[in-house]
Amino acid sequence: MGEKAKANVLVFSFPIQGHINPLLQFSKRLLSKNVNVTFLTTSSTHNSILRRAITGGATALPLSFVPIDDGFEEDHPSTDTSPDYFAKFQENVSRSLSELISSMDPKPNAVVYDSCLPYVLDVCRKHPGVAAASFFTQSSTVNATYIHFLRGEFKEFQNDVVLPAMPPLKGNDLPVFLYDNNLCRPLFELISSQFVNVDDIDFFLVNSFDELEVEVLQWMKNQWPVKNIGPMIPSMYLDKRLAGDKDYGINLFNAQVNECLDWLDSKPPGSVIYVSFGSLAVLKDDQMIEVAAGLKQTGHNFLWVVRETETKKLPSNYIEDICDKGLIVNWSPQLQVLAHKSIGCFMTHCGWNSTLEALSLGVALIGMPAYSDQPTNAKFIEDVWKVGVRVKADQNGFVPKEEIVRCVGEVMEDMSEKGKEIRKNARRLMEFAREALSDGGNSDKNIDEFVAKIVR
C-alpha cells in the first residue's frame, strides 16, 4: 500500500504543443512529490493527444487525462484566432471546469493553469479552498516587459527602451506584438490577458531557473509571489531523478526518430548544425530559399526540420543536391537530437521551450527569431547569456544567406575566441539548469514549497 497522496491538483494547459509540454513535465514533478494529478485538455484536442501519446510516456504515468469542453469539434483549426473563437472558448471552458470541480470529492487543492487561461482564477474563486496557480510558459523577462508596457510605462520604440533590471532594449528586441500589436490583435489580447489579474493569483509559477534571470527575477519577486520551477524538460536530461523520463510523453507531430539518430551517428562530434523553427513559424518562400542556400554554403553537415506543409518552398532538387551533407525531416525528436554528440549548434526561432532545451543541454545557439517573445529571447541569447549569436535581418526582416554563413562560422569555428566563449557559457548554464531541479536546487525547493502550501 503506497503512501497517501499529499494533495490533489488539476493541471490545465492551453491546447497547443508548446504549452502542453512544460505543464506535463510539471505534472510529472508533482507526481514525484506524492501529489495526485489530473491533466486537463480541451475536448477538441483530447482524443488527438491520447492517440499520439508515446508508448511508455504519458499513458504510462499514474496520471488521468480529462477533457474540458471548449465548444469545438476535434477538427476545428488550431490556427483560429478570431475574437469569436476566444470568447466562445472562454465561456465553455469556464463552465466545464467549474462543473468538473463541483463533481469532485474531495475537491482539488489547487488548479495549476496556463497563464493564457486567466479566467480560471475566477472559476477557482467560486470554489472555496481551491488555490489558483498561474503557470507562465515564457521567461520572467518577457513577463516583466509586457507588464511595463500594459502599465503604460513605455510607448515609443524609436529609442532604446530602458526598464528596471534589464539591459536597454531596441524595438526589434521587444516581443513582436508590443511594437506591432495590430499584427494579430486577438493574439496580442490573448497574451496581454495573462497579466490582468496577477495581483490576485495565489501562485505565480514560471518555467525558468533562478541563475538565468537574476536581476529581473528579483524585481518580479518584489511585486508578486514569483517562483521559478524550471526548466521543465524531461528529467533524464537534467537531474535524472524521475526514472525513465526521457520524453515529454505527448507529441502532436510524428518525429522521424530512427532516421535522425542513425544519420547523426554517422557524423563526427560537434559537426552538425541542427535547424528547426518550431511547430508554428512559417518562412516566406524567398527566405526559405535563402536559408537553404546559406546552410549549403557553410560546408557543414546539417539536420533541418521542415514541416510537411513547408517542403514545397525548398529549391527544386535541393535534397538531391545536398547529398549526405544534409538531412531534411518533417519533425525530429528534438531533445535526443540536441543531446547527440554530433551536434555543434542549434539554429532556432528562439521559442522559449527550444531555448530552455538548448540551455539545459549546453548547445550553442544561432537565433533567427520571427514573432511573439522570440526577439527578446534572441537578445538575451547573444548579449546577456552570451551562448550564441543572432542573425541580422534587413529592414524588411529578410536574412541573406551570407548572414547565415557568418553566424555559423562564429559559433562553429573551433579556433574562434567568440566560439570558445559561447561554448563555455553554454556549458556553465547547463550546469545551473541541472542544479536547479536536483535535490535541494532552487526550482526543486520551490516545487516542494508549492506542495506544502496547498496541503489542507
From Swiss-Prot:
One of its GO terms (biological process) is auxin metabolic process. CDD domains: GT1_Gtf-like (cd03784). Its EC number is 2.4.1.-. Keywords: Glycosyltransferase, Transferase. It comes from the Eukaryota. GO terms for molecular function: indole-3-butyrate beta-glucosyltransferase activity. Expressed in leaves. Optimum pH is 7.0. Belongs to the UDP-glycosyltransferase family. PANTHER family: GLUCOSYL/GLUCURONOSYL TRANSFERASES, UDP-GLYCOSYLTRANSFERASE 74D1. Glucosyltransferase that glucosylates jasmonate (JA) and JA derivatives. Also active on indole-3-acetic acid (IAA), 4-coumrate, cinnamate and caffeate. This is UDP-glycosyltransferase 74D1. The gene is UGT74D1.
